[in-house]
Design a protein with these regions (language model features):
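Hydrophobic alpha-helical segments within soluble ligand-binding/sensing domains
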Residues: 6-29, 76-77, 127, 143-160
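Non-catalytic structural scaffold of enzyme domains
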Residues: 1, 24, 44, 48, ...
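Conserved acidic residues
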Residues: 3, 91, 137
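Hydrophobic alpha-helical
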Residues: 50, 68-126
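Short beta-strand segments enriched in small/hydrophobic residues
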Residues: 3-4, 30-39
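Hinge/cleft segment of the Venus flytrap/periplasmic-binding protein
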Residues: 143-186
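Short hydrophobic segments within beta-strands
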Residues: 34, 94-95, 176
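Short, solvent-exposed amphipathic alpha-helices that sit
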Residues: 13-17, 41-60, 75, 79, ...
Length: 186
């Protein structure tokens, strides 16, 4: 039996990604999805949230493919090239997990890739760089430092102070853009 859950609502994360995608894509847009694994519940939830929000908000948007990359940048690179070669009018890529560097590398060698909007999860050095270079439009974060802090704090309060935590301690979905990490000129 678990004490509580500290983390992000991944379904909400997928819906957030879709909501952003709906705002930036043209009418009748086409999106390719790269999912870490269809067997991991967090990625299943992100995908379901994304699909549901797209169908509710922008039924004109078509999801043209869902491919697994097992968080590997090499597979994300290959999948991105496949999407772009098969669908020269691809408008967006949503990646639910790791491997964003592979998407960035593939888009570097594709003509007209500046017309492809990309949304990913997790703020890493790689995803921040891709934000700064405007390859990625949005990165959704889950505040890993805050999650770790809340885990220790909750455990301490439970063990030392005998305070029973809420069953769910939700970590909000954060949204980062290129402006979030722009270096200021002196």
């Amino acid at each position: 039996k678990s004490l509580c859950f500290i983390g992000q609502d991944h379904y909400k994360g997928g819906r957030t990604a879709a909501g952003l995608m709906c705002k930036i894509l043209p009418k009748d847009a086409r999106i390719g999805i790269i999912i870490s694994s269809t067997k991991l519940s967090c990625h299943q939830q992100r995908l379901l949230g994304f699909q549901n929000k797209i169908s509710e908000t922008r039924p004109d948007i078509k999801i043209v493919g869902i491919s697994e990359n097992q968080d590997k940048k090499e597979d994300a690179f290959r999948i991105t090239l496949e999407y772009c070669n098969k669908l020269p009018d691809l408008d967006g890529i949503y990646i639910t997990g790791g491997g964003i560097a592979g998407v960035g590398s593939a888009l570097d060698i594709i003509d007209d890739s500046e017309n492809i909007h990309v949304i990913c999860h997790d703020l890493t050095e790689g995803s921040i760089h891709l934000l700064q270079t405007q390859v990625v439009d949005f990165v959704l974060g889950q505040e890993p430092v805050n999650q770790g802090y809340l885990l220790i704090k909750t455990l301490f309060e439970y063990l030392v102070k005998n305070i029973t935590p809420h069953k769910i301690i939700d970590i909000p979905v954060t949204i980062s853009t290129d402006e979030s990490y722009k270096k200021e000129e002196p």
